[in-house]
Amino acid sequence: MTMRRIDLQPLEPFTSDFIDRTGAFNPGALEAATAIIEQVRRDGDAALRALTEKFDGVAIENFRVPGEAIDAAMAEVDPDTLEALKHAAAQIRDFHERQKQQSWFFAREDGAIVGSKVTPLESVGIYVPGGRALYPSTVLMNALPAQVAGVERIVCVTPPTKDGTLDAAILAACKIAGVTEIYTVGGAQAVAALAYGTETIRPVAKITGPGNAFVAAAKKLVSGDVGIDMIAGPSEVCVVADETADPRLVAIDLMAQAEHDPLAACYLVTFSDAYADAVEAAIQVPLADSTRADITRTSLDDHGLIVVCTSMDQALEAVNVIAPEHLEMHVEGAMEYLGAIRNAGAIFLGAWTPEAVGDYVAGPNHTLPTGGTARYSSPLSVDDFVKKRSILLDSQADLLIYGMGERAVVQIATHEGLWAHARSVALRLKALLDAEQASVAGSAAAGVEDGEARGE
């Protein structure tokens, strides 16, 4: 196992040319997902059955998981695993409760009322992947923020195992998170069903959750017809390690990411070739014991990169260019560098904060931007499950009181050539001014008549 290595010279910038990223999907996946979506839109449940048998090798008659199966799963799961899931759920719920935003309204000095109304989405579909591993944690990380946001209908779709059933831990996680609408279907066909509906599955407003290249391609294709959280590519970690870091801990943290997927990307940013050699050597021992050694080795060989820097400033700039999904700072005084880190999905500070803690029980969401998208996007949060609407209220008096503001509308709209925009305000102002003048004239006339009546 050998990771690719780059030794930067003093003041040499790290650029995106050094990064060899694998995209979320390829043209072949996009073409296949297009055909699958069309088939599901045309044939509904029949397409889901045919595609599930084709790709998963099992025949499913009823996709909906019955309530008794969900209840039974709670008894089937190892008690320690069940308690761990409950503990994780409590932490995740607590963290996301702190993200909730309230509607607000503000009465300006000119009398207008403006505000923002926060409303939960009506329905959300959560994709929970299968394949190389089973992910009950994905259920918690997607369902609990939606639940905290107030989403009434939360749907889970996940592919069947080889015997046509679902992992009991995934069902237990659904139960813990309050999800009762669960379907045994995966792949691009599940995304299509969530987006457009079938005889069995009603469509949702938004789809969240990670998946393989075909799922990512399907999410891209349905985006716009429904909302999506993000298009997630292969997972990635970047570890910045100085001479105070234990090479064994750095090594196992790189492996913890590499074991996800042969396409997972692992970056080590350090300050000497000797330390880089020590980390690579430290990988060899646990690799021999790993139950996912082949996946881990392929990931590190094909998508591993060591960047040897000459200064911390150079290292942090490399981090910002990589914009990793996960960033671990195995350096002395890690908190001091937080302000210099602009681009990362999640930041793990210090040697005692491994990524695995964030993946499961710390509370922050593990659904994170990948492939450099941390430059402009954020982790999944309660905000992903609400809508915010702007609220405006003007009265007749407001239009007169801040007439300059309304006349500014006329001025800008006229400049932009939008005649009806300008006219819609000008008509209102004219009507109000005419009414005010009529009222003034009426008052004056009444005053004259009153004076004549008194003989003045």
Where are these regions (language model features)?
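C-terminal core of ALDH-fold dehydrogenases
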Residues: 321-390
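Short internal beta-strands
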Residues: 152-162, 266-273, 279, 350
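Conserved NAD(P)+-binding/catalytic subdomain of aldehyde/semialdehyde dehydrogenases
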Residues: 178-249, 253-265
